[in-house]
Regions:
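Helix-start (N-cap) detector for alpha-helical repeat units in TPR-like alpha-solenoids
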Residues: 29, 59-60, 92-93, 125-128, ...
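N-terminal leader/linker segments that initiate helical-solenoid repeat arrays
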Residues: 18-80, 88-89, 93, 113, ...
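Beta/coil-rich, acidic/histidine-enriched accessory regions frequently appended to metallopeptidases
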Residues: 27-28, 37, 234, 268, ...
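Structural marker of alpha-solenoid helical repeat scaffolds
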Residues: 54-55, 87-88, 121-123, 157, ...
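Juxtacatalytic substrate-recognition/specificity segment
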Residues: 113, 156, 183, 190, ...
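Canonical tetratricopeptide repeat
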Residues: 64, 97, 131-133, 167, ...
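Structural signature of tandem alpha-helical TPR/SEL1-like repeats
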Residues: 43, 72-80, 106-114, 141-153, ...
């Protein structure tokens, strides 16, 4: 009994003596792991080297050490560091990172075996960390359903863990589910606002929709970790998209200075070299990447992706095919090929590749969207118009086929003549009644809220009039704009910078119709007054921000107009063509215009100052003018500032109720100062409103006429004007107004019918037939009359058989319809 008590006392004593030693060691290892994690998150690789020497037997620290060694390009040594830990624990973190390393250098069979062992291990009572490891392994093996399941299990155990939320978010980004990705990253940042991987994830999730904010997030990552390769390369990619190639090169080289064998960095360097025509450097980067990873088709996919951004879609297709030839399991390349083929109009082969990609990866949102879109396109009506193929939604085709082919013919005839260039066809034009379908057709994802059309060189996609609320845009203006892109993109070999491409298209809008392409004149003048106009060298960057893009479009069009007015149309053509041989903007300007970019900047600045001097003076707001002033004070300010638009408008608004005549006089002064103000802020809108209140319909009509000239999308004002104009006394004027209405809203059956009747009276049977066909197709309330109208126009044009068909349609609806009966007798040569 004593001996037993003595042994028990000794055991307790030994335990008491050893406990502090074990706890201290555990605490030391735990602290070292935390330090290693902080060092890794901060990109301080040398600190991790030191920790690894101090704790050579700890798997977690060994993993950080291997990651830091791999980050410096020594992939073989990184794997050798992990090897003993993998042997001891084939299902641990070291095994996971080994498998990822093996996949990363092209040893696919070994990598899959290693990761499969990670997944097949029998783990009792798995922790959140175990589920995360399984999720990452499943993702690498493209077992996305399993990965999603493991992520859910991990989150259930550790809902606020920033690493789990971030890793899950990265999976969503990979599959283009950016909204879901952002939710995961936001959860991570709630737990740790400075968690670099989550900040980088937010940057990636925002890169498509909000590039400036994405840049801010990426830059915040680099403040925490100057060696975050992902942040550097995202900034490089965004810089490429803004045509800031020098910035992109700097970001890429920052990565390659630390890791000269970084495959994605080599890929972006190759892509940049390719689009700049530096063929030897492109080949060198490709060779370096393939030496590391012999089947790294991703480098060709990335080159194709960047090349496509520069609108060189045929070349993008070639590069993406090279990616697949090198790695037939690269499902992203297969999906990309489908997307690129759609951009060159090869929808049959696009579908084949997209279906292949979708069989491999059913979680890819973009692939799913594009396949669904192709299903939507199947019932579209196809109209062959010379070298153009026009596709219209079946429920819109009966109306839009009367307008789209005619305008497309007019545009291509005018543009090919002016530019002395016939583009390669066929030119595919697709019009979408759903804006989201248009966005998916263009980028693969819904959104693109500000875009109305897109051009890929031989493919044009646009919103139909029904894709947005009537009066918010003009589909004809958009179509003309995009067809101008067809000319300039092909003439330049798809190498045009965006400022010149968009600027030329907006300028061509103004050339086509006096009222098109002028919406930004007043906002641009205000921007000029604030000194916020971009320099020519920076003009491309204006297209990457939602706050500056509208200004960039308009400024670019003014620059193109200045080039034509100063140097001539042939020199503008020469400038566009100069890019075909790979010239950059400065070289192209020198080659085509015979001046350097600074000289062009100086002459453009002078032209803007001259053009906007009067407008800028008129836009200045007098001191003391503010809302709520008494009428006498407003009068005094307006009298003292007769050249102030704001003063005259304020006076007109103040007098509108008490003295309509004086209000109209004030609005007229404002209109003389700035005649082209669009919308409800226009003095013409003020005049129309006051004139209608006082019963002066003639004055209201004149004001609305001026308003609709400068606000060509204002269909409601045009309808109001149509109601005021007496068609019996002024048929030509009424006809012009109705033409404006149907140009914006072709589905207005009543306006189309009224236009048809006026055209028929004027002897223009072609316009009458078209207008009546549209009225019939627009499902009017009085269908019988619509058919009879069309029959009458067809009969007048000598098309008796067609006229008879329409009369019979009318009589089927209303058998006792006298007018239709009379028309039938007339067609048959009889009489009552």
């Amino acid at each position: 009994m004593f001996r037993r008590i003595t042994l028990l006392i000794l055991a307790v004593a030994l335990t008491a003596a050893l406990a502090p030693l074990v706890t201290a060691e555990q605490q030391s290892v735990t602290a070292a792991r935390a330090t290693a994690d902080k060092s890794w998150q901060g990109g301080r690789f040398d600190e991790i080297d030191t920790l690894a020497q101090a704790f050579p037997k700890d798997e977690t620290i060994a993993v950080y050490h291997a990651l830091s060694i791999a980050a410096r390009g020594d992939y073989a040594r990184a794997e050798s560091i992990l090897k003993p830990f993998v042997a001891a624990n084939p299902a641990g973190d070291a095994a996971l990172e080994t498998g990822l390393l093996q996949l990363g250098v092209g040893r696919r069979t070994e990598g899959r075996q290693t990761l499969t062992l990670v997944l097949t291990a029998d783990v009792r009572n798995p922790s959140a960390r175990d589920f995360l490891r399984a999720a990452r392994a499943s993702r690498a093996l493209h077992r996305i359903d399993d990965a999603q399941s493991y992520f859910r299990d991990a989150i259930a155990l550790a809902p606020t863990d920033p690493r789990i939320n971030t890793e899950w978010g990265e999976l969503f980004v990979e599959k283009y589910a950016n909204a879901e990705a952002a939710k995961s990253f936001q959860e991570a940042l709630k737990a740790d606002a400075d968690y670099g991987p989550a900040l980088l994830g937010m940057a990636r999730a925002l890169a498509d929709e909000n590039p400036p904010q994405a840049v801010m997030f990426a830059q915040s990552v680099l403040k925490l970790n100057p060696n975050d390769f992902g942040a550097h390369l995202l900034l490089a990619e965004l810089a490429i998209y803004q045509d800031k190639k020098a910035d992109a090169k700097e970001s890429i080289e920052r990565v390659l200075q630390v890791n000269p064998r970084h495959l994605e960095a080599l890929s972006l360097r190759a892509a940049l070299a390719y689009v700049e025509g530096r063929t030897d450097e492109y080949k060198k980067s490709v060779a370096e990447a393939l030496k590391i990873h012999p089947t790294y088709g991703e480098i060709h996919r990335i080159v194709g992706m960047i090349t496509a951004h520069y609108y060189r879609f045929d070349e993008a297709v070639e590069h993406t095919r090279m990616a697949i030839a090198l790695d037939r399991e690269n499902f992203r390349a297969i999906a990309d090929l489908g997307k690129q083929l759609m951009r060159i109009g090869d929808e049959r082969n696009a579908r084949r590749n997209l279906e292949t990609a979708f069989r491999i990866d059913k979680w890819d949102v973009m692939t799913f969207n594009l396949l669904e879109l192709l299903d939507h396109l199947e019932p579209f009506d196809t109209i062959n118009e010379g070298e153009m193929v026009i596709r219209l939604a079946p429920d819109e085709s009966p109306v839009m086929k009367e307008y789209v082919p005619q305008l497309a013919r007019e545009a291509m005839a005018a543009l090919t003549k002016r530019w002395e260039f016939t583009p390669k066809g066929p030119i595919l034009i697709e019009m979408f009644p759903s804006h989201d379908d248009f966005a998916v057709r263009t980028l693969g994802l819904p959104g693109m809220l500000g875009a109305l059309g897109a051009c890929f060189g031989r493919v044009v996609t646009i919103d139909s009039p029904r894709a947005r609320d009537p009066g918010t845009f003009n589909w004809g203006e958009t179509l003309w704009h995009e067809l101008a892109h067809v000319i300039t993109l092909q003439l330049s070999g798809n190498r045009l910078p965006r400022w010149l491409s968009e600027g030329t298209s907006v300028y061509e809008e103004r050339r086509a119709r006096a009222e098109w392409g002028r919406d930004m004149d007043i906002p641009f003048a205000r921007s000029l007054e604030r000194g916020q106009v971009l320099k020519i060298r920076d003009l491309n960057s204006g297209f990457s921000s939602s706050t500056t893009i509208s200004y960039a479009y308009y400024q670019a069009s003014l620059l193109v107009e200045h080039i034509v007015e100063t140097h001539g149309q042939r020199q503008l053509r020469a400038l566009v063509e100069a890019y075909a041989d790979g010239s950059d903007t400065e070289a192209a300007i020198k080659k085509a215009l015979g001046i350097n970019i600074d000289e062009l900047q100086a002459s453009f600045d002078a032209a803007l100052d001259k053009r906007y001097a009067t407008l800028r003076r008129a836009l200045k707001v007098p001191e003391g003018l503010a809302p709520g002033l008494p009428l006498e004070k407003i009068k005094a300010i307006a009298d003292a500032n007769p050249e102030s638009f704001a003063a005259q408008m304020t006076l007109g608004e103040a007098l509108a109720e008490s003295n309509p005549d004086a209000a109209i006089a004030a609005f007229e002064k404002a209109a003389q100062l700035i005649p082209n103000v669009p919308g409800e802020d226009s003095p013409h809108a003020g005049i129309a409103a006051v004139a209608l209140k006082k019963g002066d319909k003639a004055r209201a009509a004149r004001a609305l006429e001026e308003l609709t000239k400068v606000t060509h999308t204002d269909v409601e004002s045009a309808r109001q004007l149509a109601a005021l104009v007496d068609a019996t006394k002024e048929p030509a004027r009424a006809r012009t107004v109705l033409q404006r209405v149907v140009s914006v809203d072709p589905f207005d059956a009543e306006s189309s019918a009224a236009l048809g009747r006026l055209a028929l009276k004027a002897g223009d049977t072609a316009e009458a037939i078209r207008a009546f066909r549209v009225a019939v197709a627009s499902k009017p309330l009085d269908k019988a009359t619509a058919h009879a109208d069309l029959a009458e126009a067809l009969l007048q044009a000598g098309q008796k058989d067609e006229a008879r068909k329409q009369v019979m349609e009318a009589l089927m609806i209303a058998p006792t319809f006298t007018r239709a009966q009379d028309l039938l007798l007339k067609i048959s040569g009889g009489s009552r």
